[in-house]
Amino acid sequence: MAPVKKQGGKKKKQILKFTLDCTHPVEDGIMDAANFEQFLQERIKVNGKSGNLGNGVVSIERXXSKISVNSEVPFSKRYLKYLTKKYLKKNNLRDWLRVVANTKESYELRYFQINQDEEEIHMTS
């Protein structure tokens, strides 16, 4: 007797949600969250095409200085980090800010920690 195949149910649509916390640079006035949101809308690629966001498949929302990206298609958190770094480089902020994952679904923009004391010690030796 042949094995009986079980019918598989339809997969639920998986909605991915990632957040980017730009609080510190926006408060200090070195970065504009609205400009960054516009950059993401222009650069995120869906099906190999940038700028269209897949007709509502990917959505970007901004609340104060936090930007959230919601996607119904497979979307990499790493890709979001790549685009963020590209934006920082374009605006000459890459030397002061870094992109750090603070939770599984979010990134945060932090300043590099530069220890003044260590630099002074190395300069005098």
Curated annotation (Swiss-Prot):
Transmembrane stretches, start-end: none
Q: Where in the cell is it found?
A: Cytoplasm
Instruction: Name the principal localization, coarsely classed.
Output: cytoplasm
Provide the GO MF annotations for this entry.
Answer: RNA binding; structural constituent of ribosome
Please describe the quaternary structure of this protein.
Component of the large ribosomal subunit.
The family database entries (Gene3D superfamilies) matched by this protein are listed as: 3.30.1360.210
Tell whether Cytoplasm is among the UniProt keywords.
yes
Keywords for the protein's UniProt record, in alphabetical order = Cytoplasm, Ribonucleoprotein, Ribosomal protein
Q: Which gene encodes it?
A: rpl22
Identify this protein by name. Large ribosomal subunit protein eL22
* Role summary: Component of the large ribosomal subunit. The ribosome is a large ribonucleoprotein complex responsible for the synthesis of proteins in the cell.
Q: Name one GO cellular component term.
A: cytoplasm
Mention one GO biological process in which this protein takes part, according to its record: cytoplasmic translation
Family from the record = Belongs to the eukaryotic ribosomal protein eL22 family.
Its source organism is Gadus morhua (Atlantic cod)
